[in-house]
Amino acid sequence: MSDTNYAVIYDLHSHTTASDGCLTPEALVHRAVEMRVGTLAITDHDTTAAIAPAREEISRSGLALNLIPGVEISTVWENHEIHIVGLNIDITHPLMCEFLAQQTERRNQRAQLIAERLEKAQIPGALEGAQRLAQGGAVTRGHFARFLVECGKASSMADVFKKYLARGKTGYVPPQWCTIEQAIDVIHHSGGKAVLAHPGRYNLSAKWLKRLVAHFAEHHGDAMEVAQCQQSPNERTQLAALARQHHLWASQGSDFHQPCPWIELGRKLWLPAGVEGVWQLWEQPQNTTEREL
């Protein structure tokens, strides 16, 4: 990509050490600039703790980066864990702060149960190991996975989920998150836009994926992620068609967690023709009209 248009790269889904990412907020914003991202949303799992230090680093270093405050909220729909991203939220809004505190409590309870199940499977110290890897951030299943790889119980993160953390396995604990409707509501109350995250990753049939998108749209969701780094052209086209069908704006994001060969900030993030980028809702409000959903 040429130097003349790198500033228009939008990456609206990324993680830091505040949840299950491997880079600090400060390191992430520097990497975003290195990767020629012009607008970055930090969307850690059920926490906004990374936003303030990221803002401070951008200001301190004079980085040419537009930071969008965000969050990725864990929900449950039809026994599936579904993630809803909130973009351009007010991270100080009392309702959002209270809501995320409740999510943190749910996350801590789940982590305790996962550790207890692994203990029964002769894998001691999992909670302490996950907490150590979380470095004070939100403890996620990703931290348990890293701990199990570290202990030699599996060869990779994917192997951990296959052996221990997937549905029906030893360390699996059914999620007890909020509903999609509750996530959308708190995002809207905090002034943000609600985005259905990575809809192609939930292992849903075409029929169930359509049901999910319809449910999200019916409850006043704003957008869905259409473009990601690792994605077939066919999937991107299909997701764009679903967005158009349900009058949803389109978003794009790498879901970056750590430097790796196949997922990178800003990589391969573009929208197919016929959909509109969700960033238009806050960048050009004077040209935006409400649409019937």
From Swiss-Prot:
Which residue pairs form cystines in this protein?
Answer: none
* Primary enzyme class: hydrolase
* Residues that bind Mn(2+) 2: D20, H45, H257
| Domain of life from the UniProt record | Bacteria
GO molecular function, a single term: 5'-3' RNA exonuclease activity
Q: Which UniProt keywords apply?
A: Exonuclease, Hydrolase, Manganese, Metal-binding, Nuclease, Nucleotide-binding, rRNA processing
Which positions does UniProt annotate for Mn(2+) 1 binding? H13, H15, E72, D255
Null allele outcome, as annotated, is: None of the 3 rRNAs are correctly processed at their 5' ends, each accumulates a precursor with 3 extra nucleotides.
What is the reaction catalyzed? Answer: a ribonucleoside 3',5'-bisphosphate + H2O = a ribonucleoside 5'-phosphate + phosphate
Q: How is the cofactor bound?
A: Binds 1 Mn(2+) ion per subunit. However, the sequence similarity to CV_1693 from C.violaceum tends to indicate a trinuclear metal center.
Enzyme Commission (EC) number: 3.1.13.-, 3.1.3.97
Family membership, please give it: Belongs to the PHP family. TrpH/YciV subfamily.
User: What is the protein's given name?
Assistant: 5'-3' exoribonuclease Rnm
Q: Which organism encodes this protein?
A: Escherichia coli (strain K12)
Gene name of this polypeptide: rnm
